Amino acid sequence: MKKIALVALVMTVGAPVCAEVETTVGADVVSRYIWRGCDLGEAAIQPSLGVSAAGFDLSLWGSTGIVRFADTKEFDITLSYSLAGASLGVTDYWFSVGPEPEGRYFRYDEKATNHVFEAFAGYDFGFASITWNTNFAGNDYKANGDFAFSSYCELSAPFSAGGADWTATLGVVPFESPLYGTDGFAVTNISLTAAKSLEITDSFSLPISAGVTLNPCSEMAYFVFGISF
């Protein structure tokens, strides 16, 4: 995804540079919001804001429907650390729909919050990457009242072909999860996406993408187009 990058040097008076901070600002417009093989709504705008330094990254991400305003709104905060291909992090997902009927953000009561907290770990081998994600708190309970610890494992491989950057992805849910709608181990995400820059003028191009996603568990298929800014 192409981002607008602003680089700032953090300095003390009369001292040399002590850290380099990079800020990224961007937005995507997608024809449908598909996440890990799950359908989360129709066309949406998805802004992002991130700050990174010394391997640490703090990012904000959101999604708001632009066709059906009633679609669930989302606001995520992720803190992660990366070193030599390995990464660890925590994400706070917030949804406008959930156990908290008024959708209030600052409600963290057990079994009455619209937040979901997830920890993740991954490794990028260069030719492929793998990530494991597990919920550890928030709105993720089974029908019997037990916390589900919903988990998702994803393997992705980037490659170039035909003048485009492609990504092939395989995602699985290892055990029962109310969040992903599975009763046990299930393949929920088989996707292939191509991205390239569409040249508008000699000095301006627009990053676009298109991809197909199959969810064998729900027996659904999706084709999504996106524009990045």
Residues covered by each model-derived region:
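Outer-membrane beta-barrel proteins
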Residues: 18-229
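Cleavable N-terminal export/targeting peptides
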Residues: 1-22
